[in-house]
Regions:
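Zn2+-dependent metallopeptidase catalytic domains
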Residues: 1-175
């Protein structure tokens, strides 16, 4: 995977090197890395800002740095192979986002940080970040019964598919 230009590039995205066949493997690898990092953080049980929030933000940043350039190229290149590669990632990203948002252990870890002595020493921005993350857990259905979580996941995937189809249709119409 080290030859994939979407993974761990130093500064600006290497747009000229990005090919459609790089997109899905990069996203799959980075989602797997994100899942592994979440499990590692939870297993370590050290729920302070550096070990919880910053660690997971770094993984999210890696995923965003990979998928962001792919999304940009998809929007401007009007290349069917790239569009297919981009679209093939959407269900995985939707599933991963919902999975993270509904992770009760992760939500509890953030709540532990919120209730800790460290809370008062965090900056206003850091506190707001944690509060927003706790809100996002609730909005993602972390407290729903399992059957409702599954329905939420299915709805999220379907919304992702429809949004992508709408964008594809817009691009197709613009090129007419």
């Amino acid at each position: 995977m080290s030859n994939n230009p979407l993974i761990d590039y130093p500064e600006l995205p290497p747009f000229s090197k990005i090919q459609p066949e790089h997109v899905l493997p990069a996203v799959e690898q980075l989602v797997a890395d994100g899942r592994a990092r979440i499990q590692q953080v939870l297993a370590e049980g050290k729920f302070d800002y550096a070990h919880l929030v910053q660690a997971l933000d770094e993984e999210d940043d890696r995923l965003g740095k990979a998928f962001g350039p792919a999304g940009h190229l998809n929007a401007v290149a009007q290349n069917e192979a790239l569009r297919n590669a981009y679209n093939s990632c959407l269900p995985l990203l939707s599933e991963y986002g919902t999975e993270v948002g509904q992770n009760a252990q992760l939500c509890a870890a953030y709540q532990t940080l919120r209730d800790s002595d460290e809370w008062s020493s965090l900056s206003e921005a850091q506190q707001k970040d944690i509060e927003n993350t706790l809100r996002d857990f609730r909005l993602s259905g972390v407290d729903l019964p399992e059957d409702k979580k599954a329905q939420y996941m299915a709805n999220s995937k379907r919304l992702s598919e429809l949004t992508s189809k709408f964008s594809d249709n817009k691009i197709g119409r613009a090129s007419c």
